[in-house]
Amino acid sequence: MAWSAQQYLKFEDERTRPARDLLAQVPLERVLNGYDLGCGPGNSTELLTDRYGVNVITGIDSDDDMLEKAADRLPNTNFGKADLATWKPAQKADLLYANAVFQWVPDHLAVLSQLMDQLESGGVLAVQMPDNLQEPTHIAMHETADGGPWKDAFSGGGLRRKPLPPPSDYFNALSPKSSRVDVWHTVYNHPMKDADSIVEWVKGTGLRPYLAAAGEENREAFLADYTRRIAAAYPPMADGRLLLRFPRLFVVAVKK
C-alpha cells in the first residue's frame, strides 16, 4: 500500500512534536553514522540533520512518495529505500532513530533487538510509536469496517494493527544489550477544528489501509460513516473544537 506525503504533512507540526521529544532524550552530542528509520517526508530527518549535520544522517523508508518528498526537502542528505523488517546498515551506526514506524513492523520487538547489534558501543536506538488502538479514532475504524456493505473486504482482520507490547517487554528485549533503557508514555492532546479535521489526520496514517480495502466505489460512504462515528465520540469543548487524545510510547536504549 502506498502512502501520501502530502496527506501526512497536513498536520506536520503536530506529527513532528513527538519526533522532537524523542530526539531531546538522545544522549549523543556527536553522530558520525546515523539513520532515520521510516523517515517519511523528511520532517524528522531534518531535526536530525539540524542537530548532527546533513552528511552524517541517512533517511530510510519503504515508500517512494515519502522518499521523493524527503529528498526534495533535504537535497544534501542521503535517502534509501528498504524494508525495516530486514534492513541492516552497511556498517555499525551511532544512532538508529525511528519516529512512528515500528508499530507497522511485524514482531518489531525482535527487530529492535536485532538492531541493537548494529550499533557501536555507546550508540543509541531511539523509537517512538503511537499507542492509540484503544482511542475512539481506531475503535471507529473497526466499527465502520464491520458495519457496512464493504465488510467482506475486512473479514480476514489483517488490517488491524497489533497492540503494542507492555513496557516491560521492551526492557526485557533490550536490556541484555544495553547499558541503559528508558521507556515512557506521553499523551498528546491536540485541539482540532471539527470531526472532519480528525478524519483528515487519520487519513494520513491509520485510516489509509481501511480506505484502500473498502475500494474506491465505497470510499465516500465509508468516510461518511466513519466521520459520523468520530463526531459522536469527541464532544466539543467550550470553544467548539474537539480534543484529540493521542498516546505515544517512547523507547531509548544505549548499547553496552
UniProtKB/Swiss-Prot annotation:
Broad enzyme group: transferase
Coiled-coil blocks: none
Subcellular location: Cytoplasm
Pfam families in the cross-refs: Methyltransf_23
Gene Ontology CC terms, in alphabetical order: cytoplasm
Sample GO molecular function, one term: trans-aconitate 2-methyltransferase activity
Record family assignment: Belongs to the methyltransferase superfamily. Tam family.
UniProt-recorded name of the protein: Trans-aconitate 2-methyltransferase
Lineage of source species: Bacteria, Pseudomonadati, Pseudomonadota, Alphaproteobacteria, Hyphomicrobiales
Gene (UniProt): tam
